[in-house]
Amino acid sequence: IDLTTDATPAQIKAALGPIADALWTQGERFGTIGVKVGDRVFEITTHRAESYAPDSRKPEVAFGTDVRDDLARRDFTVNAMALELPEPVLVDPFDGAADLAANRLRTPLAPEVSFTDDPLRMLRAARFIAGYGLEPTADLVDAVRANAGRLEIVSGERIRDELDKLL
């Protein structure tokens, strides 16, 4: 189960450490703490914003307090939705639910920005199109064509992993 919160990694560890059967912190610098409670595994990530250097797909991470800012950094609108708890209220600032209903694949921000920031998202787009039958928007297709050369900054292992998921 993936959760996002305005709590910092230190606050997450302090709150859940005493009740966790296991707790792992490999992703802590990106704001992610893993927790196992009983037979359930949770990844809890602090809301964040990211910025990228032009020659890297590794983000500079800044923790935030607003889930909407966190959703803006997601790869596609269908992944940029959240349920606000304890009352289940859908937070959908980029109309991901409508895109899901229309089988449409779109990025929350301009696709050129999204694919420049993280070129691996172009391969993820291919996987979502093939695996879920989503139809890409014309601007997404144009951005993939224009940014295909950016895949050179992605490690071969990451490309292989994404192609394995595609197949």
Language-model region placement:
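Catalytic cores of the polymerase beta-like nucleotidyltransferase superfamily
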Residues: 1-167
